[in-house]
């Protein structure tokens, strides 16, 4: 998993890790983890931090070594990539860049990928995703739709 990180990322993570490894023993406490993550531009919630710690801290000794930290950061980066992919997909559908996917935009994209849909089918797709009932799909509704897949 950590193999997917670039040398630059590993170096950046090592630097951040070292800042919080006060005694230089190659371990950081779980309490310090949130501070390390935030220094790297991540913003995990308390429950996300606890989940990450539980996944990584196999011996439950309350500390995380650098290889464990790298594995965890690689996982976090992978999650971020999928968010970016969803954002890019939304832009493909939102042809006029107004922040919404209309029935016409949905029909156009579906037709361009070879999906021949009737107006009723397109309207049904919009209805399924359209949580606020405004007849179009906003970014948050699109994310919800994509996460269900």
Curated annotation (Swiss-Prot):
CDD domains from the entry? EFh
**Residues reported to bind Ca(2+) 3:** 94, 96, 98, 105
* CC annotations in GO: cell tip; central plaque of spindle pole body; cytoplasm; hyphal tip
Keyword Repeat annotated = yes
- A GO molecular function held by the record: calcium ion binding
Q: Which domain of life is it from?
A: Eukaryota
Gene3D superfamilies per UniProt: EF-hand (1.10.238.10)
Alphabetically list the UniProt keywords: Acetylation, Calcium, Metal-binding, Repeat
* Chain positions recorded as Ca(2+) 4 binding sites: 130, 132, 134, 136, 141
State the Pfam families in the record: EF-hand_7
Q: EF-hand domain location, by residue?
A: 8-43, 44-79, 81-116, 117-149
Which GO biological process annotations does it have?
Answer: microtubule cytoskeleton organization; regulation of cell cycle; spindle pole body organization; spore germination
Q: Which residues carry this modification: N-acetylalanine?
A: 2
Residues annotated as binding Ca(2+) 2 are 57, 59, 61, 63, 68
SMART domains to which the protein is assigned, alphabetical: EFh, efhand_Ca_insen
- Residues given in the record as Ca(2+) 1 binding sites: 21, 23, 25, 27, 32
Record's miscellaneous remark: This protein has four functional calcium-binding sites.
Q: What does this protein do?
A: Calmodulin mediates the control of a large number of enzymes, ion channels and other proteins by Ca(2+). Among the enzymes to be stimulated by the calmodulin-Ca(2+) complex are a number of protein kinases and phosphatases.
Hey, which family's this protein in? Belongs to the calmodulin family.
Name of the protein = Calmodulin
State the organism of origin. Emericella nidulans (strain FGSC A4 / ATCC 38163 / CBS 112.46 / NRRL 194 / M139) (Aspergillus nidulans)
